[in-house]
Amino acid sequence: MLVCMLMLALVAAACGSTASNETAKAPAASTPAPAASTTAPAATPAAPTELTIKHQLGETKVKTNPKKVVVFDYGMLDTLDKLGIEVTGVAQSSLPPYLAKYKDAKYKNIGTLQEPDFEKISAMSPDLILISGRQNASYAELSKIAPTVFVGVDAKRYMDSFTENSKIIGKLFGKEAAVDAELAKINETIKKVNAKAAAPDKKALITLVSGGKVTAYGPGSRFGIIHDVLNVVPAEKNIEVSTHGQSISFEYIVEKNPDYLFVVDRETAVGESKTTAKQVIENELVKKTNAYKNGNIVYLDANYWYLSGGGLISVAAMIDEVDKGLK
């Protein structure tokens, strides 16, 4: 009997040990996975459908991506051309050769730079009109037809004004990245010219030749980018700032004796050339200057400097001309 009882006790102990081991081996209950986030990603802000543009003649509300664009300012036309933005109407009468494609019949002729054809422009129902100094007097009348923005460059703050105008176009047409890239290239060239202009023998006089007469331009003038942005030292700092420049004599040029003489030929640009600027400038008096003696009379392309300017194409070309002219 005792033996039987001992055997039963051993069997019970063994069963208890097995149950205990199985309990120990059982995996612990897994920790619940964190619930998936239900927060939606932040929505990208919608692009504005209208911009309020501040300019020299006021403020103008313009819808973004305007389809029918009328352009009087050739500098702005070359910016639009560079960015691949189509226009509807252009003042075709004085187009510079590098913008000759806009003489095509697919572009409406909107009058001359001084006399807009208001009736024709109104019939086009434009979404945007871009003007500059030659159309100042027509601003109010054009504004009755469509949103009108003044995009002429302020000569006293040339690069800031040019940059602002370029960025306005970038925002209006969704071309910000392209505008920034072009501006970066231009600024790199400016740095290169600044380094050249730092030399002590680079004093310059800027002139315009028209009808056999010569006028001078200095800092703050329409051609003052040479001094104000490119840092070329003026041969005379106190030149009258006016649209048509300060009337000067050939004796004046000899007196100032510039190391560089920059010349813009107005008559070539407007098609009234009887004599070239070179024939007028390179006379016996001017031949006494350092500029002539050292081969540093630089004839600038009036299509950029006189007819247009202030655009992505023209400003780059203007700076490049000065860069090549400085030795």
Spell out what each predicted region is.
Residues S125-I131, P147, I253, N257-L261:
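Proline-aspartate-enriched helix->loop->beta-strand connector
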Residues I145-G211, N296, S308-K327:
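Extracytoplasmic substrate-binding proteins
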Residues D259-K327:
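Structured C-terminal subdomain patch of bacterial secreted/periplasmic proteins
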Residues D73-K120:
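A short, structured surface patch at a secondary-structure boundary
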Residues P48, K61-P66, K101-N109, N231-S242:
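A local structural motif
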Residues H55-L57, I110-D117, E240-S249:
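Short helix-initiation/N-cap motifs at beta->coil->alpha
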Residues L2-C4, A13-Y74, A177-L205, T268-S273, ...:
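Bacterial Sec-exported substrate-binding components of ABC uptake systems
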Residues L95-A100, A216-G245:
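Alpha-helical, coiled-coil/dimerization segments enriched in small aliphatic residues
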